[in-house]
Amino acid sequence: MSDIRIIPVTTKKGLRTFIQFYYDLYEGSKYAVPYLRFDEWNTLSKDKNPAFDFCEAQYFLAIDCSIPKVVGRIAAIINHCANDQWNKKQVRFGWFDFIDNLEVSSKLLDAAAHWGRERGMEELVGPLGFTDMDREGMLIEGIHEKSTMYVNYNYPYYPKHMDALELFQKDNDWLEYRIKVPEVTPPKFAKTAQFIESRYNLHVRKFTKHELVQGGMAKEIFHIVNETYKDLYDFQQLTDRQIDGYVDSYIKMADMNLITGVVDGNDNNRLIGFGVSFPSMTEALQKNRNGKLFPWGWLRLLRVMKCHATDTVDLVLIGVLPEYRNKGANALIFADLIEQYHRYGFKWAEAMPQMESNKGVQSQWQYLESVQHRRRRCYRRKL
């Protein structure tokens, strides 16, 4: 007979246990991609994550006291900035992992709900992170395919538990596409790119690392993110401290050829759109099952970053200012990125999750050989 108890995480040792549970649960999985351990630590630590400027959180562990053993975890998060922006009183749940035991999953969700209710929240939603830059959604389609480092992976029994709990309903779905890199740039993109260059004086802009980091262009990219994504599901405007963190963590590591900007020649070459890609880390991280960089993990990642030792590229971020969306700026971005993908020998591109309702973004893939191969869901229940 199991004896499931839920305990709050209150120490650094407890946080290490919270993080470790994921690696234990997914050890040996062919599809899960181990997250970088230091990245998890920085995200979940109050003294390291700038999101705690406007968020509060509590982490919980499920313990089977009859063994004893950790059998589940959950993070309860209140993003006060997002709640104010969208006029909601929501507590989010994330980092939600558990063994195939309905008592475990239900008690973890109850703990998150109780914590939120004590703080005046009226809804429980998730899986979500602190902000939209964190992993979101529970995988409900494409579970038997390799994941990526940027999204959640979960076992098939996860959504079955959510269905069994009944109080939860669908709040939002995200779709993911796998795209075959074409041998030549599709005529739709090539012709449109040529047309808008001459018609609207929009041009592709490549950057040096100095221009991006020291020159401030990377911050401009994230300012476009704030403007482009502002009306998307529960999006919260990124703060300057968050932007600085993303520049340090990701942009500094990026291959400059895989970052494409579009500028308006009629407006002092103002940046109006961008696309950011990274070589896929999936294979390298799967060989490094524990999420640690040492002793050999960093060499595998470096080989991918510098030598492009993978046939897949991840299209991580793309954005165009609203007033330029109907001027074909996306065609310029894709035409340039496809050229760079050819240069490095990439055969496949993984597009990051897009809202099911975002038909404009999804319509782009009709001009390429693509398949919608994953779907993930966010759930909601009243408290």
Residue ranges with predicted function:
Residues 125, 178, 261, 276, ...:
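Short beta-strand segments
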Residues 2-4, 152-232:
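Acyltransferase donor/substrate-recognition loop-hinge adjacent to the catalytic core
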Residues 22-64, 74-84, 206, 212-318:
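A conserved beta-strand-loop-helix scaffold within acyl/acetyltransferase catalytic domains
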Residues 1-32:
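Generic start-of-chain signal for non-secretory N-termini
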Residues 130-132, 182-184, 210, 280-282, ...:
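Short, solvent-exposed loop/turn segments at secondary-structure junctions
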Residues 57, 172-176, 374-378:
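Short hydrophobic/aromatic beta-strand or adjacent loop that forms the aromatic wall/cage
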Residues 83-167, 291-367:
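Acyl-donor binding region in acyl/amide transferases
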